[in-house]
Amino acid sequence: IPLPESTARVQVIHNSPDALASAVDVYLNDALLIDDFAFRTASPFIDAPAAVDFTVGIAPANSTSSADAIATFDYNLAANETYIIVASGIVNAAGYNPAPAFNLEVFAGAREAASTQGNTDVLVYHGSTDAPTVDVVETAVTGGATIVDNASYSDYAGYLELATLDYRIEVRDETGTVTVKSYEAPLNTLGLQDAALTV
């Protein structure tokens, strides 16, 4: 009787703003895993091989094979682990400043649901290539609590385990005095109770 193959759970998020990578094909070794994967979209969690070496290739949309890859990355995932992999950075630096290199940023210990029933777990990732080191401040519920401190580009700030309420967040520079951007985060309105998500 053959032993079952070891697997890991993986979600891939396309966050590369490079126009050359506005949509890509994702290969697992030579097999097409995700076809025409668009910027700012996420795959579902899927089973991936664990405890073996494999290559992820990123190719232009409508590629014909893994040989068309513009970037490749080698992995060996831990069995029974859950990962989020975010594609970030710039493929071709022309016209971009700053232009951090294209990379796949891996987070182990990802969640497919909130760890506490009734909450919403939010994994914070700083994926803006031209934003400074930032703080994230919540103003609607907590009255100004800093919920993420000094996150730099490509950093995962870990999970926020939040009551499922409607929040307003401000992204500020690392001094905490200059607001870069404000966002509504209506977790309750969107029905995200018990969910885990990445922002």
What spans do the regions from the language model cover?
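Intrinsically disordered, low-complexity polar regions and short flexible loop motifs
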Residues: 1-199
